[in-house]
């Protein structure tokens, strides 16, 4: 099993939106970065665990735990001219972007803020806490996962 962190802006699609979905499950669409796409397409597997992270908000931090319930498949929002994620270079025959389906397992007991995560030497190699990392999808080691659950 692999571990991940996926960022979202709560004003666009946050934990409350996912919790309100049927079966607390939805597709994770709109990722438009090749490195993040490759992780979703090639590395995310059924059962992988994912931290849900709220970004671009008053208190950025980890707010929930999700599970990958469908492996990577073409992101249909790229083909929709009305979608904010439309990409005219992506087609059903030659998809450029991929998504996975995730299910909300549970909210974390509290928001675990980025400011707190940055204080722990155990997390210094985590991409989230390194300067300049803007990826919306990133790997988390098993040790980092367990440590974060321990401070929850």
Language model features by range: what are they?
Residues 1-46, 144-145, 152:
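Compositionally biased, charged N-terminal/linker segments
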Residues 3-4, 26, 99-100, 135-138:
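A broad, low-specificity signal marking well-ordered, structured residues that form hydrophobic/aromatic
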Residues 46-51, 100-102:
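Hydrophobic/aromatic beta-strand segments within beta-rich folds
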Residues 51-52, 67:
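Hydrophobic beta-strand signal
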Residues 53-60:
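Short, charged beta-turn/beta-strand-edge "cap" motif at the junction between a beta-strand
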Residues 64-135:
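Aromatic- and Lys/Arg-enriched surface recognition patch
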């Amino acid at each position: 099993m692999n571990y991940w962190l996926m960022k979202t802006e709560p004003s666009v699609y946050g934990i409350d939106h996912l919790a309100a979905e049927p079966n607390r499950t939805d597709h994770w669409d709109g990722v438009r970065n090749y490195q993040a796409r490759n992780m979703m397409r090639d590395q995310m597997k059924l059962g992988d665990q994912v931290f849900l992270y709220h970004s671009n908000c008053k208190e950025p931090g980890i707010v929930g735990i999700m599970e990958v319930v469908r492996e990577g498949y073409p992101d249909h929002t790229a083909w929709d001219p009305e979608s904010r994620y439309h990409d005219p270079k992506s087609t059903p025959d030659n998809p450029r972007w991929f998504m996975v389906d995730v299910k909300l397992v549970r909210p974390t007991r509290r928001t675990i803020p980025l400011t707190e995560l940055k204080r722990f030497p155990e997390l210094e190699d985590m991409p989230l806490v390194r300067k300049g990392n803007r990826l919306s999808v990133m790997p988390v080691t098993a040790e980092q996962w367990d440590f974060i659950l321990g401070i929850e």
